[in-house]
Amino acid sequence: MSADNHQVPIEIRGLTKHFGSVRALDGLDLTVREGEVHGFLGPNGAGKSTTLRILLGLVKADGGSVRLLGGDPWTDAVDLHRHIAYVPGDVTLWPSLTGGETIDLLARMRGGIDNARRAELIERFGLDPTKKARTYSKGNRQKVSLISALSSHATLLLLDEPSSGLDPLMENVFQQCIGEARQRGVTVLLSSHILAETEALCEKVTIIRAGKTVESGSLDALRHLSRTSIKAEMIGDPGDLSQIKGVEDISIEGTTVRAQVDSESLRELIQVLGHAGVRSLVSQPPTLEELFLRHYSLGPEVAAEQQVATP
């Protein structure tokens, strides 16, 4: 096992995992290259957290192959954990330790800490490190975990819904920090069900559904997934909106217009509606669940499977 010479920090092929009769992973493939911020996307229950638990050596796979920093996450867990940092979506801390003590303890498990970066991150995230962990809100517990991971010497970050509990200002700080980590050459696997967060941070994306990889590639190659829902209350007649390229699923009921529009055509559609006269207009990016329903035709069997599968 080598953690020093690896062009592919994460290499997963045909990964399977069952929990009783529930199939959590069903032949999953995932490749994350060195220095990459890689989005790992899927609706809740798709198998993202199970995959991360296998990478962390907390769960043993039933089948397939997994290489993490050149090693086996199940048999080489102790050595590998000196080079990786993990941030879960719901952080649990030692209640009697202060935030600062917890940051240092976690970082020591990861091969040490950059004290200057630690101090900078505490200030940027607005954390009081002298308070006991038992007094922290969910957002502050999340900050402790993020600060420890980002100030450590880890070469690989495994992030499972890491911005959960952060307010919009702190989420912006988090995104800046991930960009800085990438500039330092750190590899990041970001598990999320939020498409916008992934678009802001990641250059590559792997999308999974029901424990299988359904798409993987650059964000530019996956732009067809990103459509915005439009609902407008009209004053005038907008005309034939189907003539606008990238506008689909158009429905008109009385004065209410609904449509789906590609990001490249959104501005043109809004201009056309505005010229016709609009009382109100609401635009909403699609949820991942909507994207999967639209692009991958989720059937009731798969939907039910996702409800019971380990996330």
Curated annotation (Swiss-Prot):
ATP binds at G42, P43, N44, G45, A46, G47, K48, S49. Disruption phenotype: Inactivation of the gene leads to a 4- to 8-fold decrease in minimal inhibitory concentrations (MICs) for ethidium bromide, novobiocins, biarylpiperazines, bisanilopyrimidines, pyrroles and pyridones. Induction: Transcriptionally regulated by RaaS (Rv1219c). Expression increases in multidrug-resistant clinical strains (MDR-TB) compared to drug-susceptible strains. SUPFAM superfamilies: P-loop containing nucleoside triphosphate hydrolases. It is a peripheral membrane protein. The complex is probably composed of two ATP-binding proteins (Rv1218c) and a transmembrane protein (Rv1217c). Belongs to the ABC transporter superfamily. This is Multidrug efflux system ATP-binding protein Rv1218c.
